[in-house]
Each structure stands twice: as C-alpha cells, then as structure tokens.
Amino acid sequence: MSYSIGIDYGTASGRVFLINTTNGQVVSKFVKPYTHGVIEGELNGLKIPHTYALQNSNDYLEIMEEGISYIVRESKIDPVNIVGIGIDFTSSTIIFTDENLNPVHNLKQFKNNPHAYVKLWKHHGAYKEAEKLYQTAIENNNKWLGHYGYNVSSEWMIPKIMEVMNRAPEIMEKTAYIMEAGDWIVNKLTNKNVRSNCGLGFKAFWEEETGFHYDLFDKVDPKLSKVIQDKVSAPVVNIGEAVGKLDDKMAQKLGLSKDTMVSPFIIDAHASLLGIGSEKDKEMTMVMGTSTCHLMLNEKQHQVPGISGSVKGAIIPELFAYEAGQSAVGDLFEYVAKQAPKSYVDEAANRNMTVFELMNEKIKHQMPGESGLIALDWHNGNRSVLSDSNLTGCIFGLTLQTKHEDIYRAYLEATAFGTKMIMQQYQDWHMEVEKVFACGGIPKKNAVMMDIYTNVLNKKLIVMDSEYAPAIGAAILGAVSGGAHNSINDAVDAMKEPILYEINPEAEKVQRYETLFKAYKALHDIHGYKKANIMKDIQSLRVEG
C-alpha cells in the first residue's frame, strides 16, 4: 500500500492531505487558516493602497511543517510508504527571495515595505504596468497575445515584477530569485531552483517552444528582459514529471523518507480537474471558492478573447488547458453575509444555522426575476471576459421594499450570468461545452445556488463531492511522481472524487433567466465596454482622495 501527500495552498488557508494512491481514500487531513491571513488595508499598522493584497510566506512553511507532522502522526502510516508530494497554489502569487531562497520580506530593513511581501493572486497594484504591457503588445502585433485572450491582467507575474522594478528598486536589488509561491515551496522541499510549466505558461508569458517573450519585454522596459533572465528563468519541469527527491535536511525535518518524490506545482484550480476526473475536451469545470475558475481542455490551441490563457500540457500532457474566471464569488457572498441586518444574524443564531443557510431558505421558493433586481458581480474587477480589474460592482432595481435576501439572490444570479458569458465565449470560439462540472466547497453546501446555475446555463450540472478537489489533484501528481501510477490518467481514474448529485434545468426557469440574462448582458456591455469610464471616474476620486 502506498500513499501520497497533497498540499493545497488557497487564498485564506492551507490544507495537507494524506491520500491512498490505490483508491483515493482520504487517510488524514490538516486544515489551518494562515496566521497572517491576507494582508489588506494596512501592513504592520501602516496604511497600504486598497488595490494591494499581500501575504507572509512564513505562513506557507507553517502549514507544510505542521500539516505533514500531523497527518503522519495521526495516520500512523510508515513514512517509507509515502511515495510522493504534490503542491497546488493560488496563482499568480509571487515571492521575492535571496540566493538561499529566503524571502526578502524577512529582512529587517524591509519589514514595513509592502513590495517585499508575497503579492497574492488578487493583488491589483500593478494595473498601470499591466496596461503598459498590453498596449506595447498591441502596438507591436505580438503573436502570443491571442494565447492570453488578447489581454494582460494585473494579477499576472510580469506586471507585478514591473511594479516592484518601478516602485521599489531597492527590493529588486536585494532579490536573487522571483517565482510563483508554488515553485518556492517545491524548491524548499527539494533544495533546487526550478519552475513549473503550468505557472510560467499561464502567468509569465512563457511558451514551451519559444520560452519567454523577450522581444516584447525589451520594448516594454530595457531592464525587464535582464530581470527575467537573471531572476525568473530556471529549468522547467512539466506537469506529470518529477522534480526530484526530498532534500535530506527537509526529509528529516518533516519526518519523511528522503526517497519521497516531489512533483512540480500546479495552479490550485487546475489541480481540481484532476481531483474530480475531468480529463477530456468538451467539459467545462467551475472551480468555485473565493473566486471561480472556468477550465477546459482541448486538443487545439484556439485564440479566445477574454480568457486568461491556454497552455499545452499544463494539466494533462498533450492537451491544451484553458482558463477563464471571475474574481469575486465566495468573497462576494461573504461580503453580502457580513452586511446582513442584526435581526437576520440573531434569527440564524437562535435557529442554530448560518446566515447563508437562513438566506437560502428565504429565497429558495422565489422564481427568477421575482425581486426585480439585477447586479454586476465586479466587486473585485472582471477577469473574464472583460479583463479589467478596475471595474466595480453595482446593483439595479432597488426599492424601499427590497429585502436583504433579494440582494443576496441577485448576486448569486450575477455570478451565474458571468459564468454564462464565459461559457458562451468558449462556444463562440470553437470550443463546444457538453458537460459542466461544479466543484469546491460552495457547490457542495449551496443547492439553491446550483439550481440557479443549471437554469441560467441551461445545462445539466454535475456537482462533485469535492470540497477539497485541489488537494486531491495535487496528491494525484505526487502519486505519479512517486511511481504509484504510470500516468496522470491512470492516477486520476484510481483517485478521483465521486459525484455528489446531478441537476437538470427546468424549462420555465430557463425562459425567465433568458430575459434576465439579456438585461445582465446589456448592463455588462454598457459598463464594461461603452461607458466603463463611469465606474473608473468614481474610483479615481477614491484613489486620489
């Protein structure tokens, strides 16, 4: 009997799972919020811009060390039988280190400098750099731009590097290496300096055949190419391969065998496809958490406007992986729940239920459109298909009779409409969608939301029993790297998570949602394309004030 470890680094917490490689059984698990959480608003008591989202990398090591120690102790499994470790991580979450892989934010002189810290995926401080990169690419007709949806996001690696170059050159001077936080964990485990093809391909303008796009970098900033060459470029390891064995000192520290193999890191949402067994084309998978990623696989590389990238072999060898997404889903619902009236909070507490459960109870018998509300779910910008992190959310149709649960439902529907925009974009660019999977903690807990989604999309929805699909996917890669399975496909077949339930659309609801979707799309196009300056003009007062 052999086992593998999957370490899943999410936005707010980390998870360490011990998985049976034969049948995918969860033998032990460890879940812990990050000690420093997401650093927003202020850093060590000092105010930082509202577009910043940072983290402390020491939290990542804490998760790994405490988690592995716990699962080995709790399971009583002989560490010799743990053959591999897989890592998944939010992305693009980037870290700046010295030549010994020590994060520069741990240097005393940079304790209060936000640019020394990990830049979390939802850090939007590099929006000016992203715009410059995009405009330069457009002006020079760069051929790669279509592979990234004809856009550049401030959430990606290169704009974030440019941000530090421009605003904190003293940090860049002390930095020896820049990498995805997922690569950093892998390198700490193996004492190597490598990069994953998944992270580079989706977030750093790198392609397997041509490498980095230095011709573009040279035109953006004469210094950029050298920074990438010196600090980012490193040997690349593909998904499905092994980086190598655990470093001897790390094996001793973690209580594992030094023969334990480590796989390259995979982006967290991408790991979910492996965890639920979506390994074919014509299947769209919604990985739903704080944000939602919409992933597809295809034999060909299509240039789909508004997506976040397409990379060969980033999930399944020989297939192109496509990513699109929404920047605020679980985060948005949490925001609404926190605004709930005291009477709702008290009622939920008295009935021993959550505010979410209470609001779902209040809306579950409503018909689509009953509240008269429609919303735009852009509270953290719009990732796809508008690719504009400076857009903001809004809600229409409020009256003095509007109840809090009506607002909640409007936001549930808005995220479903945003997903339909993405699905239609895939379909419009030669990527047929026959199956839709939903995975993550939210689909498993919120049947009302799944009912909304199946009717908005007018597709059968396959809801997975998969609150921890990324961790399972990471463990699958660990199992492959450790030799427990001959291929990713074999490992997926043996270790994937089961289906929880399937739900089909209802004709009357579908028809009503078609009317609502037309209204959503009209508002989407007005405030996203035609008059996007309205929101941005208001936001400029916030930035300047």
Swiss-Prot record:
GO terms for molecular function: ATP binding; D-ribulokinase activity; ribulokinase activity. It catalyses: D-ribulose + ATP = D-ribulose 5-phosphate + ADP + H(+); L-ribulose + ATP = L-ribulose 5-phosphate + ADP + H(+). Pfam families: FGGY_C, FGGY_N. The keyword Protein biosynthesis does not apply. GO terms for cellular component: cytoplasm. Pathway: Carbohydrate degradation; L-arabinose degradation via L-ribulose; D-xylulose 5-phosphate from L-arabinose (bacterial route): step 2/3. The keyword Heme does not apply. Coiled coil: none annotated. It comes from the Bacteria. CDD domains: ASKHA_NBD_FGGY_L-RBK. Its EC number is 2.7.1.16. Keywords: Arabinose catabolism, ATP-binding, Carbohydrate metabolism, Kinase, Nucleotide-binding, Transferase. One of its GO terms (biological process) is L-arabinose catabolic process to xylulose 5-phosphate. Belongs to the ribulokinase family. This is Ribulokinase. The lineage of its organism: Bacteria, Bacillati, Bacillota, Bacilli, Bacillales. The gene is araB.
